[in-house]
């Protein structure tokens, strides 16, 4: 499915992929949901997340935290508080370090709590996104705080694209767990 360029497509792709993500998770045996990722998963790609995330919980809290980034960024800027998407001191070159800090923050978060947090944050994101028009979501430069991108592009990245990433990793976990 191509990247969303309308509000309707954004909402449909975010909800659709979120539903597919949960179908995949709910289809896993409890034992596999709670199992650590196989060591070979760390070798599946060059991106930092392949070595960072050790289990399903780590991935779910990552998605949750990126929802929080999106929500806080939009809410702050709408309230007139000029804020970048990534919190200080991070930028787009250093955000992998931020992801590690987010990972550390949740090492004692139980899987069941991670699941409920993610479901609640997805709903909060969807509730906020529905308040914007097509123009507000997909017109470059409409909000000065989105820089050279659009609000919709940030939303796609924090929802549908991130859910695709999670499904890819979960499928790899299932495959390596059932060998």
Identify the residue ranges that each predicted region occupies.
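Aromatic-glycine hotspot motif
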Residues: 1-57, 65-179
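Conserved H-X4-D acyltransferase segment
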Residues: 60
């Amino acid at each position: 499915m191509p990247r969303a360029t309308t509000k309707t497509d954004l909402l449909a792709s975010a909800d659709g992929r979120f539903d597919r993500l949960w179908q995949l998770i709910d289809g896993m045996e409890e034992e596999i949901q709670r199992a650590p990722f196989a060591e070979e998963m760390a070798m599946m790609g060059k991106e930092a997340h392949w070595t960072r995330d050790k289990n399903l919980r780590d991935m779910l809290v990552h998605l949750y935290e990126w929802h929080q980034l999106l929500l806080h960024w939009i809410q702050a800027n709408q309230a007139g508080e000029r804020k970048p998407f990534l919190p200080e001191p991070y930028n787009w070159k250093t955000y992998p370090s931020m992801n590690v800090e987010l990972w550390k923050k949740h090492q004692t978060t139980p899987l069941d709590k991670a699941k409920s947090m993610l479901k609640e944050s997805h709903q909060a994101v969807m509730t906020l996104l529905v308040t914007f028009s097509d123009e507000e979501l997909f017109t470059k430069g409409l909000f000065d705080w989105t820089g050279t991108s659009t609000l919709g592009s940030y939303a796609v990245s924090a929802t549908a694209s991130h859910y695709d990433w999670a499904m890819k990793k979960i499928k790899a976990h299932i495959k390596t767990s059932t060998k």
